[in-house]
Amino acid sequence: FLATASLAPDGVLRVDRPFSRIFQRYGRLVMPYLAALTVCVLVAEVARPWLGEEVVPAEPSLGQLLAHGLLLQDLLNYESLSTGVWYVAIDFQLFALALALVGLPAVLRQPTSAARWAPVALVFIVAVASLALFNRQARLDETAFYFFGAYGLGMLAFWVGRATRTSTWCSAVALLALVGAGALAIDWRSRIAIALVTALLIAVAQRRQWLSPAHWPAAAVPLQQLGRISYSLFLIHFPVLLAVNALVAGLGPHGPWVDLLGMIATFGLSVGAAVLLYRGVEARPASLRSVCTLFAALLVSGLIVSY
């Protein structure tokens, strides 16, 4: 949804330098990701004696660190250094695939009359193929094609929400619902059902302008703030969890109240760490120098724990 808003809000690619945009996306994704992985590698080394190998990732190899930095860890079958890092790699693949699909008609120099609809048609075709075929093949779950069904629904929902004619909007929503229902009839998948319902709700919300912050109640402000740091929170919560669990384990036998306090502390510390990660890394402009510096920090952390 958001990728469509930045790449082709009107169905025509608005990016002059696609490869530069791909690197920009890579930088935005990996800067906080590399910083969080560096913290995780160091925290895991401290927590390992208290929690054991089953809970804590093993000491990383150089190849494993390089693969994670290049977002190739799953494709190269390396064990993850933290929870959820597969999502970052898939998000980057999905963005690159979306950019390729939206930009292909321009490369092929389609006639002006077809230039607006060709990208939408390509996204629709690949999304349907993903829903009906690719998403049902477990061996493809390390690639963007496996997830593009849900991603494509979000892209299509954005374009549907911008339809000016009521009849066009209703027809597009009906087609979107029909495609999703057909995919679920072929093979029920709860995640696809959630993606379909979410896409339809977003299309309605965009149509009624509910997505504008001006229409949100004051009580939603804290949620907006949490949403702003949500990516950093997603990345940093695991090393915080490891650190708190190691501390609790080091206390020896304890009761449920200690576990409860540990959970509360984990949440509070995770939010605090996410704020620091967001302000110190994620909110800063992506640059080659910053990416290389953070990549080097990850490699150095691996060397530190290996000796």
Predicted segment positions?
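Final/C-terminal transmembrane alpha-helix of multipass membrane proteins
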Residues: 291-307
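Hydrophobic alpha-helical segments with transmembrane-like composition
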Residues: 29, 69-129, 277-278
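Hydrophobic alpha-helical transmembrane segments of multipass membrane transporters and ion channels
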Residues: 31-39, 93, 232-236, 290
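Alpha-helical transmembrane segments in multi-pass integral membrane proteins
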Residues: 3-20, 102-106, 135-290, 307
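Membrane-interfacial loop-to-helix junctions in multi-pass inner-membrane proteins
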Residues: 13-34, 51-58, 109-118, 286-292
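Small-polar-interrupted transmembrane alpha-helices in polytopic inner-membrane proteins
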Residues: 36, 114-134, 172-179
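Membrane-interface helix-loop-helix regions
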Residues: 29-90, 197-205
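Hydrophobic alpha-helical transmembrane segments
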Residues: 30, 117-121, 260-268
